[in-house]
């Protein structure tokens, strides 16, 4: 039993739909804005960290080059000092045994130790893998966080796609959600541009089925009578037909028995139905003719009977007249005394 829906309830339902859609769309937009801001902040921090890393790396390279130049100069000076010290500090001493010993100052040993320490400092100033990792650690962390934020940003539902899904269900109730107005609107009525359903075409369409059986019968008879004689002709199944002097048609491939049987049955059923319709029409015509003949016969018989009755009445009248005349003549003869015959 169809219960009529109140207008107020319809408006309440529409208001509920509007509020729900607007809330979901606003939440989606807020989430997208928040993650977009986060991604922008991470992108700026990543750019700053990369700039700092490259600047730090260049500064360390410059310091390394400067230290190498200073160390090379120091080494040259130390070598010259060693040579000068060797020349100035060599002392010839003689022992009791008469051996000559060369005594160098302790400055030579000290200079050698200084050279070793400077070489160790140069080796320590070169950057290692740990230094590189610490240098690029903040930039790598920021890049990973930026990638995750972008993934989350694009994983959030799009408001346009959400509205299209909502409209796909609202179309069933002849309403839709307008994104620009943010309201539920009624669908406009469809206007048919073609004039197929006009009065003239509809009347012609009603008259067409009366002519279809004759046209279809002519088509079937024409198809059965048609014969292919050309070598490049093909039948309705696509099989090539080759002319033969003994027979008009020779098929390269025989028809399937089932399909041929069904095709012939369809023609037989249609022709039989059409013949039955014609027979029924003929029977109706015969019935009409018999009715007309019976009516004519009955009317003719009635007319003949009436004519016979008229003849009988005329005969009776003649007989009455003759009797009257005879009686009058007899009375006249009797009164005059002589015989008179009619």
Swiss-Prot record:
Record keyword Phosphoprotein present: no
Keyword Membrane in record: yes
Top-level taxonomic group: Eukaryota
Annotated localization: Membrane
Membrane-spanning residues: 35-55, 134-154, 161-180
Region span, Disordered: 198-220, 311-342
Key words, A-Z: Membrane, Transmembrane, Transmembrane helix
GO cellular component, as recorded: membrane
Membrane topology: Multi-pass membrane protein
Record protein name field: Uncharacterized transmembrane protein DDB_G0284971
Native organism: Dictyostelium discoideum (Social amoeba)
């Amino acid at each position: 039993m169809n219960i009529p829906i109140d207008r107020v309830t319809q408006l309440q339902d529409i208001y509920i739909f509007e509020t729900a859609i607007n809330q979901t769309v606003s939440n989606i937009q807020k989430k997208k804005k928040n993650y977009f801001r986060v991604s922008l902040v991470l992108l700026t921090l990543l750019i700053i960290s990369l700039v700092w890393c490259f600047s730090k790396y260049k500064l360390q390279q410059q310091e390394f080059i400067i230290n190498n130049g200073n160390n090379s100069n120091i080494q040259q000076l130390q070598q010259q000092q060693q040579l000068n010290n060797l020349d100035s500090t060599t002392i010839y001493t003689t022992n009791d045994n008469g051996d000559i010993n060369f005594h160098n100052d302790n400055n030579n040993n000290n200079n050698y130790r200084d050279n070793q320490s400077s070489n160790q400092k140069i080796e320590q100033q070169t950057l290692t893998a740990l230094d590189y990792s610490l240098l690029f650690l903040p930039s790598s962390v920021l890049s990973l966080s930026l990638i995750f934020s972008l993934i989350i940003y694009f994983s959030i539902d799009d408001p346009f796609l959400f509205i299209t899904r909502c409209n796909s269900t609202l179309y069933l109730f002849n309403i839709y959600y307008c994104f620009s107005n943010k309201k539920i609107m009624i669908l406009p009525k469809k206007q048919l541009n073609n004039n197929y359903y006009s009065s003239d075409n509809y009347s012609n369409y009603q008259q067409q089925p009366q002519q279809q059986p004759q046209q279809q019968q002519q088509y079937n008879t024409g198809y059965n009578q048609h014969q292919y004689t050309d070598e490049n002709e093909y039948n309705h199944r696509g099989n090539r037909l080759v002319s033969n002097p003994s027979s008009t048609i020779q098929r390269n491939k025989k028809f399937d028995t089932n399909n041929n049987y069904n095709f012939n049955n369809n023609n037989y059923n249609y022709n039989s139905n059409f013949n039955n319709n014609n027979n029924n029409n003929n029977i109706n015509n015969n019935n009409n003719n018999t009715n007309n003949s019976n009516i004519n016969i009955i009317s003719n018989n009635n007319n003949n009977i009436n004519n016979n009755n008229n003849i009988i009445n005329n005969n009776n009248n003649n007989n009455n007249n003759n009797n009257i005349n005879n009686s009058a003549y007899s009375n006249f003869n009797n009164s005059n005394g002589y015989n008179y015959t009619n």
